[in-house]
């Protein structure tokens, strides 16, 4: 997550209390061309999962940004991101950030080799 933050991407964590937050959703609205892209499924967004080291099931949707499904998915995501309607789902990156060098280098090794537990 630190790589994303350092690249200027906003990151929030699911605010869990013993349970796991397991869903994966990538939503991209591309500026300028009015397109919406979403990847939903079981794959973690890591080399191990995206380079076919694990059997995963995902679906990719490419829609006009003003399509009803794109609007609905964006509303759903924004509700989780912004804790809307009195429901609490996420917290800022700083709440769970852990940038210890040992963790960073373990992550780098696991990503480079495709050997990981995530």
Please state what every model-predicted region is.
Residues 1-118:
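PLD/PLD-like phosphodiesterase catalytic module centered on the HKD motif
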